Amino acid sequence: MIIKRIYNNNIAMVDDDGAERIVLGRGIAFQKHRGETLDPASVDKVFTLDSPDAISRFEKLAKSIPSEYIEVSEEIVEMLHRESDLEIDDSILIALADHISLAVERERRGVTLANPMLFEIKHLYREEYALAERAAEIIHEHLDIWVSESEVGFITLHIVNATMEQDSQQLIQCVSLIKDILDIVGEVYGDDVDTESLGYERFLRHLQFFAERALGTGGEQDDADLPVLLDRADYPDAFACVDHIAEHVKTTYHVNVTDAEKSYLVYHLVTLFGTNGRDGCDA
């Protein structure tokens, strides 16, 4: 490992057989200079940033925030690899360190940033949210401060984003659309639903796929997959609700919801709420 750049005593960039890597370890760069050899045995953690853009963003971040935030983020990334089977992109280190530095400063000033998508995040990404709660514990262990539940939700999105091909703005747009749909459903059916039920989980999962398709990040829905075709006269609330959803998607996102998509949404609403909230159809 040849040192290319030193950020502080504990963090450096090295050339490792032609690959640029970020290495961390207590005192690994102390009294070291660019061009010198770094003993791999002194390195605790190695991160690979695959693009020049990621490397550039890391360098800007390393110059702008205290190294403790990068080190805490490194610990969190290690936890994610260790405690989950998710394929986590190491570039999450950059986004996490940046977010944690801002989140901790907000908490220290007594400022809580609202997260209007928290409910949807907790239910759509249960595994990732649990990992984000572990991340909050690590932040507390190292920095002696608890971040809010809203911040845990934002950390969840960073974890989800590190496992998906879509960028962070697409992810936020997807969750925002799901929230809009749930708000519309709530207007029609009220809040009398078991949000921990398997039926609700299936409904949320379908909304996730629906949102991805509506926003152009997923394939089309085939109505041949429907277990049963339903009649508008039998389920007026469900059809009216879906009409409202389709109009919202068209107005807000300029996307026409197909008949197949509408039929599947109706089926899920009827399965979950029944006729006017009473008589359901079999899942």
Where do the language-model regions lie?
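A cross-family "folded-core" feature that marks the main globular domain of proteins
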Residues: 1-283
